[in-house]
Curated annotation (Swiss-Prot):
A cellular component term, taken from the record's GO annotations: outer membrane-bounded periplasmic space
Note on how the cofactor is bound: Binds 1 PQQ group per subunit. PQQ is inserted between disulfide Cys-127-Cys-128 and the plane of Trp-254. Binds 1 Ca(2+) ion per subunit.
Name recorded for this polypeptide: Quinohemoprotein alcohol dehydrogenase ADH IIB
GO molecular function: calcium ion binding; electron transfer activity; heme binding; metal ion binding; oxidoreductase activity; oxidoreductase activity, acting on CH-OH group of donors; pyrroloquinoline quinone binding
Gene, per the UniProt record: qbdA
Length: 690
């Protein structure tokens, strides 16, 4: 007897993979996640970017039973900064070099991968590692920005490229590391590169066709040319001199965005000036709009509704690109639609997101560059001499910031914001008339001098901050900075990975340590959570990296700071186990010889190293472990130093040629500095030995 057709069709549907039946992601689906926590469809989970999940199967009472459900080894040796997305049983995430993978969330099986084949030498003009912070979903497509400035749409089922747009001028040192967002059918993407002399902008592309819809420049260009949009005419009045457009200006939109569908406002954060030192890029002062600002933009047209400048006339790399979070807070007995940000400069800002008016701003950590933010003017009250015009200064925070890109989260239940706080001093020196723009790290702020910051004064913490009272609720200290982002849940939990290689769960209300997992790799990314077949999971990309690990220094050489790249997925009663890590290779210590060159030659090498080499090989020649430590380079490497640096002998391995920027005598000075540092450190170790 044949089965009724109706029954046969039902069985066919049940047997069909969910991905094949999946409804496309749209605005309604993303907005629905505000109440339903099963899926994670956008970078910060919802348009508000709260990184809070209403899921509570895993809670403070049972999180001790959390275990590894499965893991996936990744062919990745650089930093993993992405927050995975989850839709209809599939995890979508990105790795270094802008590669994308889709993974079956139940089994951990790879479904497809896409490699945009970014040239490895592109890392030379990417300030902060070959990282990527994630992808976007819309309709039946996955979107990724690439390190070389492309925006690519992929088929969500197959990973095949559908369209690709070069969003930047490939002849200029732009890069993309941030995750795209999709708003009203438009893919929003920014870029980075201010340290190398670019002009910032944010663009919107049609999600279906890839056609450019609009572009908003964050700083003015050549005043002899027409302004691209009227906002730039007003911005130009806040710049001085006749060089700023030649130096790039900066203001890149390299990370944070949020969207309010009811107000129909897209919020984006802008970055630092190019170069950092205002005295060089805009002699005579000025606020330099729209650097270090929060912009509210109409997503249909790209028109500016309002702006708030976090750090006027920035001279310290105090970006406003840190996470923007939207919420409703009860302030003075009234509900307010607010925007919250804890940017690099160390003040926690609460703004009225309808008009950009400042509600409150207080220090959330050690801040010496400014006394306070004047609520009447919305401007910081700067400390004397903080702009280092006359003499070098040491101040807090540093260019790493009191909070960097590592995601914070807001829990509406506790009313607290969970911030990956870091305390690192900055050293700044005015290079002034001696500054020369080169194809290198152009700060004009004495970047090489930051090598003198000792590890003993560096620390980090998980900070629970009350945005209404503007004070800390609790704090968990860590031995160093550059810890991962946070996730908070309705289960009264906060999850965070650390630089030292642990994944933690704390109670969201009190900060009590409830659970810990040894991840075998430093973690910089933020966790996410999803539900599949009635079971809640927590996932994180574990892979040590990012700018702090490249610039290195003593504080980036703690135990656990390794890169063993994996996608880790946890659930209650998970039974999977990581294999034991391979033992570290034995180090053979060389007995170096003292450098007999003139001190001025070594000092010149130090300045050149700071500008050209430190961003990859580590400040003070102390590598963070991802890129070779030049103090330990072999005799053969030293012998062929000129060929490597100028002729590109190691270009296939990602070491670019600097023949367009350095002279042979300068390369020799760099080598002398490296050798002198090797000798200094060797003598210091043996002098300290018992």
């Amino acid at each position: 007897m044949k089965k009724p057709l109706r029954t046969s069709l039902l069985m066919l549907c049940l047997a069909t993979p969910l991905a094949a039946l999946a409804a496309g992601v749209d605005e309604a689906a993303i907005r629905a996640t505000e109440q339903a926590g099963g899926e994670w469809l956008s970078h910060g989970r919802t348009y508000a970017e709260q990184r809070f999940s209403p899921l509570k199967q895993i809670d403070a009472s049972n999180v001790r039973s959390l275990g590894l459900a499965w893991y996936m080894d990744l062919d990745n040796t650089r930093g993993l900064e992405a927050t995975p997305l989850f839709h209809d049983g599939v995890i979508y995430t990105s790795m270094s070099w802008s590669r994308v993978i889709a993974v079956d969330a139940a089994s951990g099986k790879e479904l497809w991968r896409y490699d945009p084949e970014v040239a490895k030498v592109k890392a030379r003009t990417s300030c902060c590692d070959a990282v990527n912070r994630g992808v976007a979903l819309w309709g039946d497509k996955v979107y990724v920005g690439t390190l070389d400035g492309r925006l690519i749409a992929l088929d969500a089922k197959t990973g095949k490229a559908i369209w690709s747009q070069q969003t930047t001028d490939p002849a200029k040192p732009y890069s993309i590391t941030g995750a795209p967002r999709v708003v009203k059918g438009k893919v929003i993407i920014g870029n980075g590169g201010a340290e190398y002399g670019v002009r910032g902008f944010v663009s919107a592309y049609d999600a279906d066709t890839g056609k450019l819809a609009w572009r908003f420049y964050t700083v003015p260009g050549d005043p002899a040319l027409p302004y691209e949009h009227p906002e730039l005419r007003e911005a130009a009045k806040t710049w001085q001199g006749d060089q700023y457009w030649k130096l790039g200006g900066g203001g890149t939109v390299w990370d944070s965005m949020a969207y309010d569908p009811e107000l129909d406002l897209l919020y984006v954060g802008t970055g630092n000036g190019s170069p950092w030192n205002r005295e060089v890029r805009s002699p005579g002062g000025g606020d330099n709009l729209y650097l270090s600002s929060i912009l509210a933009i109409r997503p249909d047209t790209g028109k500016l509704a309002w702006h708030y400048q976090v750090t006027p006339g920035d001279s310290w790399d105090f970006t406003a690109t840190q996470q923007i979070t939207l919420a409703e807070l009860n302030i003075d007995g009234k509900p307010r639609k607010v925007l919250m940000q804890a940017p690099k400069n160390g003040f926690f800002y609460v703004l009225d997101r309808t008009n950009g008016k400042l509600i409150s701003a207080e220090k959330f950590g050690k801040v010496t560059w400014a006394e306070k933010v004047d609520l009447a003017t919305g401007r910081p009250v700067e400390a004397p001499g903080v702009r280092y015009e006359k003499e070098p200064i040491v101040m807090w925070p540093s260019p790493f910031g009191a909070h960097n890109w590592h995601s914070m989260s807001f829990n509406p239940g506790t009313g607290l914001v969970y911030i990956p706080y870091q305390e690192v001093p900055g050293v700044y020196r005015n290079e002034g008339k001696d500054f020369v723009t080169r194809k290198a790290f152009n700060t004009a702020a004495g970047f090489a001098d930051a090598t003198d910051v000792p590890a003993a004064v560096v620390s980090g913490a998980l900070l629970a901050w009350d945005p209404v009272k503007q004070k800390a609720a609790w704090k968990v200290p860590y031995p160093t900075h550059w810890n991962g982002g946070t996730l908070s849940t309705a289960g009264n939990l906060v999850f965070q990975g650390t630089a030292a290689g642990q994944m933690h769960a704390y109670s969201a209300d009190k900060g009590e340590a409830l659970w810990q997992f040894e991840a075998q790799s430093g973690i910089v990314a933020a966790p996410m959570t999803f539900e599949l077949a009635g079971r809640q999971y927590v996932a994180i990309m574990a892979g040590w990296g990012g700018v702090a690990t490249l610039t290195g220094g003593e504080s980036m050489n703690l135990p656990g700071m390794k890169n063993r790249s994996r996608l880790l997925v946890f659930a209650l009663d998970g039974k999977a186990q990581l294999p034991p890590p391979a033992p570290a290779p034995a180090k053979v210590e060389r007995v170096p010889q003292p450098v007999t060159a003139a001190p001025e030659q070594v000092q010149a090498g130090k300045q050149l190293y700071g500008q050209f080499c430190s961003v990859c090989h580590g400040m003070g020649t102390i590598s963070g472990g991802l890129i070779p430590d030049l103090r330990q380079s072999s005799d053969a490497t030293r012998e062929h130093f000129q060929q490597i640096v100028l002729q590109g002998a190691l270009k296939p391995l990602g070491m670019p040629s600097f023949d367009d920027s350095l002279k042979p005598e300068e390369v020799e000075q760099i080598k002398l500095y490296v050798m002198s540092r090797e000798y200094e450190d060797y003598m210091a170790r043996h002098k300290a030995a018992p």
